[in-house]
Design a protein with these regions (language model features):
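N-terminal nucleophile
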Residues: 1-209
């Protein structure tokens, strides 16, 4: 497979959301939909395009006038710009958004863009073939939940054949991962230790899909 993705969306349980479906406004796009901002956290298109976004850590200041980060993904899926050009374009406009981590793939390449409004420069990186774990801390944050997930995915992908159920076992794991001091992760919620699991259940917040 050119691309294998196993992912969860962690969000407030009461945030209105539609599960993955082909959008009637853009029938080539398969994605979930956030019904507040009308964007998406992850999706694919029939043109072989893929996009996914996570919010930056809670320690980064936010501003109310920011454009919804869910538009970062859907605009790429709807468009024809290459992943590299789109990522470069966003890099110059990243201060219009609150902190984010963005994955973009077209049929020829895959790119990662990390942006924090407090930084003078965003991070733009082409991803070579490999296994990557993305969290709210970024693609190279070293979060233990990501390292554990990467290890499990590596074991699955080394097999000649695997089932979707194998991927589901990875993202449905509720085991808590060992954690460094929470201050180093930029986390603030009282339930932060619970967020170390692949499948999060923390009061009013947790894994939605």
């Amino acid at each position: 497979f050119p691309l294998v993705v196993a992912a969860n969306r962690d969000e407030q349980y009461d945030r209105p959301t539609q599960p993955s479906h082909f959008w009637h406004t853009n029938p080539d796009i398969l994605a979930g939909r956030d019904l507040i901002a009308n964007g998406t956290w992850m999706g694919i298109s029939k043109k072989g395009r893929f996009a996914a976004v996570t919010n930056g850590s809670q320690s980064v200041p936010k501003f109310k006038a920011a454009i919804s980060r869910g538009t970062l993904t859907i605009d790429f899926l709807k468009g024809d710009m290459s992943a590299e050009k789109y990522a470069s374009y966003l890099s110059a406009r990243s201060k219009l958004y609150n902190s984010f981590h963005l994955l973009l793939r077209d049929p020829s390449s895959m790119w990662y863009l990390e942006s924090k409004p407090t930084n003078t420069l965003s991070k733009l990186q082409q991803l070579t073939p490999g296994i990557y774990g993305l969290s709210n801390g970024g693609i190279d944050s070293g979060w233990n939940k990501c390292r554990i997930g990467e290890g499990k995915m590596s074991a699955i992908l080394q097999k000649d054949e695997f089932e979707i159920s194998n991927l589901m076992e990875v993202v449905s794991d509720k085991s808590l991962a060992p954690q460094p001091p929470l201050s180093s992760l930029g986390l603030k919620r009282e339930e932060d230790p619970l967020i170390s699991a692949q499948f999060v259940s923390a009061g009013t917040y947790g894994t939605r899909c």
